[in-house]
Amino acid sequence: MPEASKEIIRAAKKGDVAKVRGLVATDAGLVHAQDSDGSTPLHCATWKGHLDTVAFLLSAGANVNAHNRNDHWGTTPLHAAAHANQAAIAKLLIEHGADVNAKDLNGKTPMHHTTFHKAKAVAKLLQSYDAI
């Protein structure tokens, strides 16, 4: 993986929105970088609960429905928000076009993830969007 890709993944995981902005200013394509699991900076920032970083990545054109297909789950950022019970981030992802019924590689939707991980706040949000 190129060094700039490693840097943006690390910065997204840390919630270092200034670093993410700087990297994207240098190379806009970095919003689509992937780690060894196929997770994008948007997956990473979502998983860790970094709302400001998620908002910036979305404004910079990150794919809200990207699947991390290199691992055994194949989840989208909305699956990550469901898993981590990040309701504010889930709402932002949905407002930017996230598919509330996207299926991971095991056929599970974000709603399935909320049930398994007891993510009640995200489950309630997804219900309001008629997610299954």
Predicted regions and their residues:
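Alpha-helical adaptor scaffolds
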Residues: 44-60, 65-75
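Ankyrin repeat A-helix N-terminal signature
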Residues: 10-15, 44-50, 80-86, 113-119
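Start-of-repeat signature of ankyrin repeats
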Residues: 4, 38, 71-74, 107
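Ankyrin-repeat boundary/linker signal
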Residues: 34, 67-70, 103
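Intrinsically disordered, low-complexity regulatory segments in ankyrin-centric signaling systems
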Residues: 1-26, 32, 36-39, 59, ...
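Ankyrin-repeat-protein effector appendages
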Residues: 1-10, 96, 116, 120-132
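Ankyrin-repeat inter-repeat connecting loop/turn
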Residues: 30-31, 64, 100
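Ankyrin repeat structural motif
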Residues: 16-24, 50-58, 86-94, 120-127
